[in-house]
Amino acid sequence: MEHESFKASERLVTPAYIRQGREARRMHEQLVRQLVEQGKCPKEPWDESTIEIFLNELAVMDSNNFLGNCGVGEREGRVASGMVSRRHYRLIHGIGRSGDISAIQPKAAGSSVLNKLTNSMVLDIIRLAGVRTASSCFVVPMATGMSLTLCFLTLRHKRPKAKYIIWPRIDQKSCFKSMITAGFEPVVIENVLEGDELRTDLDAVEAKITELGAENILCVHSTTSCFAPRVPDRVEELAVICKKYEIPHVVNNAYGVQSSKCMHLIQQGARVGRIDAFVQSLDKNFMVPVGGAVIAGFSDSFVQEISKMYPGRASASPSLDVLITLLSLGASGYNKLLKERKEMFVYLSSELKKLAKELNERLLETPHNPISLALSLTSLSEQSGSAVTQLGSMLFTRQVSGARVVPLGTSQTINGYVFKGFMSHSNNYPCAYLNAASAICIKKQDVDMFIKRLDKCLRLCKKEKHLAKDEPRCAQQTTEDDVAELAQGLGDVLQGETASELLLSG
């Protein structure tokens, strides 16, 4: 309520009580004012009531929620289902206009404020996470692959003769298809093996640039976050090469915001060389539903060019989700999650190393990968060709998600390109292995349960050879111990939620 309404309320209720209520309301308003004025993620989290007040205030600024609105156009923010309307907090118009995803909508002032604030808050988080000189970013309602495509299509207008993209190999389909979809020819640079790690072959990159001609290359497409034993590209050195040959540089930073090491690589690359844009996933870094990404860069004008390349208006759902999430966490809450992730990486590494020693395997030495780990499966691979993939199936049926097994000798054809040793980022990696990652929001309980189930599965797979024929059938059966373990895990979760509710109510 505004001031006059509060004054009028004093005729209905004791004025002292009304003044107290007005002060409570003012506290919410002060938080909103600080957010709008500063455009930064608040240090401390907001409670849900403040967030809902703010979103409702934004919604009533959109024309579809005007009390006397009369819409006669083809797109008037009409929604048939009340449930759908509530799901979106009645913010129906989306973001941007037909020519620019970052443009203001005249009949959706509230949604436009939401869009601008979200972009500003995400930029603040990117800077806090380590890329301090990033100048601009925007949330786009497409996942990482399509967002990379948008960057490549923008560069096409700057380099119309270019047809190649230099790409140090990473065995992940969407980043490869992003180049194909944009109409370019990927030039795959094989990684070099250094110890257990797969690292960028800088000499091969420079040789290809010389061979093809810099003017024929759209950009270098490098990667930070990835599955071990591949490690982040030598972004700093690649940035220097790009600056030397005046070639654009786009970085796939899919889940790198959560890693200070990945963010430092981007910051250093921009400092000593050239990075035009870096793209990161919303769901992997900000714990929201799949379907959004952040495109960021060091030049306001170039980032704006990318936003103008997006055709039509766009869904506001990813922007709304990340806005609510960052307000719920605050900068302090997000930093806490980043710190916990680092701690859990150390814990996961130590537990896998213990298990590897017990089972005569090895945790591969990949010190340059800050998120993913790899456990060798040498003895399992020697046992039989299908034993490695069988382990993956066993883990999945025991409700272990995210872990992936990489057998030897797998080939995959993507858009006519043949990748030998697919999933291992190399034609001939020396051993089969299993991946596990310490990503943001992972808990100690996740690690403990994973190690316990992995131990069981590996011991099953390593039974005497005369039992091997029965293993595929038996291994898939869920035992009473498995059921008891799942029940215990569910009980721990429910107990934790009950404790949280009691703390909140207290």
Swiss-Prot record:
GO CC term, one of those recorded: cytoplasm
Cofactor requirements of the protein: pyridoxal 5'-phosphate
Chain residue ranges for the region called Tetramerization: 1-44
Chain's role: Converts O-phosphoseryl-tRNA(Sec) to selenocysteinyl-tRNA(Sec) required for selenoprotein biosynthesis.
Residues that hold substrate according to the record: R97, S98, Q105, R313
Pathway(s) this gene product operates in, as recorded in its UniProt entry: Aminoacyl-tRNA biosynthesis; selenocysteinyl-tRNA(Sec) biosynthesis; selenocysteinyl-tRNA(Sec) from L-seryl-tRNA(Sec) (archaeal/eukaryal route): step 2/2
UniProt: pyridoxal 5'-phosphate binding residues: R75
Protein name: O-phosphoseryl-tRNA(Sec) selenium transferase
NCBIfam families cross-referenced by the UniProt entry: selenium_SpcS (TIGR03531)
EC number: 2.9.1.2
Similarity field: Belongs to the SepSecS family.
